[in-house]
């Protein structure tokens, strides 16, 4: 299965008629493995800051998580594994696997819990596959 199929079929899937606004699978070097057409252009330093927070949890809390120039307030996550952020009625979930970052961005009517489930389910599957 191609990385694009993982984005199209597993991340941008319908949940009760709703879907993520944007999604991507990135290498931990910041390279794009696959992304939805709606995924924002991002800066390398934004990915570096996400990776730093995954290595040293709490570093993004004071400044917020930035992706594509959009600032998300960092909320609860799982140290070293998941970062969750909120902006207005939407937000972001980032799941770290052995080799990749799975990123999902959502807005209402999709809920934070649905975004978390979509992103983390694929991340857990890839971890089980050694990826």
Curated annotation (Swiss-Prot):
Chief place where the protein resides: cytoplasm
GO molecular function: actin monomer binding
PROSITE patterns for this protein: PROFILIN
Keyword Cytoplasm annotated: yes
UniProt-listed Gene3D superfamilies: Dynein light chain 2a, cytoplasmic (3.30.450.30)
InterPro entries: PFN, PFN_euk, PFN_sf, Profilin_CS
Keyword tRNA-binding assigned: no
Biological function: Binds to actin and affects the structure of the cytoskeleton. At high concentrations, profilin prevents the polymerization of actin, whereas it enhances it at low concentrations. By binding to PIP2, it inhibits the formation of IP3 and DG.
UniProt similarity note: Belongs to the profilin family.
Protein name: Profilin
């Amino acid at each position: 299965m191609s990385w694009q199929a993982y984005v199209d079929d597993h991340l941008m899937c319908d949940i009760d008629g709703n879907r993520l606004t944007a999604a991507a699978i990135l290498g931990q070097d910041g390279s794009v493995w696959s992304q939805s057409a709606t995924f924002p252009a991002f800066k390398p330093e934004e990915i570096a800051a996400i990776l730093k927070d995954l290595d040293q949890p709490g570093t993004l809390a004071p400044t917020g998580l930035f992706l594509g120039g959009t600032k998300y307030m960092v909320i609860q996550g799982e140290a070293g594994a998941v970062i969750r952020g909120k902006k207005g009625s939407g937000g972001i979930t980032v799941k770290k696997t052995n080799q990749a970052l799975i990123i999902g961005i959502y807005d209402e009517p999709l809920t934070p819990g649905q975004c978390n489930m979509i992103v983390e389910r694929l991340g857990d599957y890839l971890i089980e596959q050694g990826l």
